[in-house]
């Protein structure tokens, strides 16, 4: 009997491996999670990332429209999947490339930009922050740092681990990274799903000290925020949030929020856009339990970069306005987003929400996707485009 069982064991194990392989082959992609049967025939799918950045001559910068007095120019190109930008103290612009797994340094050489790869083979690096000569990099599973990098661009220093007690989930696992007014390092931990009750470790904005100690949660119920900034005067944390998919093409709206104090819950997965209970997880709950959105920014617009303008080049009324870069939708028949929006906060009144730059979407065709902004020392504004692999510069002259 024992011999028979042992002889049969390889067959059983082989059959189990075959079943597992078949199950994996038949499993839907993660972006389809939560799709109702009524939308099973939908042809909507994420927009594929181009295999290479566009050549400078192929980038139609003239199609980007901005208010009168403003001008857009191509500042740098050939940066595959250009995402988050942060300045070094000596004038180096560091740029992340999530899909390429690289981090770049862009150096201005007398009006010409030279791009150098300073880190490669990383795990979906997105967030970058710089302080006291140190570049901090956020991957899916860890935060690292490169000490003295601006003096070693041609021979980058080894990456040192700052914090690595992070989930490894790929869905919404990429992170934004920024230093707050308190000197702490803030980052997001997205929900590991389209819609689910996430573990307590997910769907939040968190912070640590620069040495990786003192981890704590700042905001809860945040499905996926990959961009935030602090008000220059009040020091309150403002952030953009991507809402769930497959509830409809026109709902729910993405959000622009303010964490006026630590510990607020912003509704995920129970309430969407502040007034829609989730049909599955919202039963027995009320949207009044959660912090409402400051602005409903639109369905599936995918707001990423959030930045308060503090420069002096733009007109005086632009001071302390917020630029919100929207990467754009994939799950709407009529595309939305693909713009840089502007938010004017008004005491005692609803914020003003308007277009600042648009043109990456032409009819139903896209040629670029604005994802993040970063001010220059002279007050001009850089816009990163991860689809074209380019960075644009917006200037103003009366």
Each PLM stretch: what is its role?
Residues 102-105, 142-144, 204-206, 255, ...:
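A short loop-to-beta-strand structural motif that recurs across blades of beta-propeller domains
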Residues 92-95, 134-137, 184-188, 236-240, ...:
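Conserved beta-propeller blade signature
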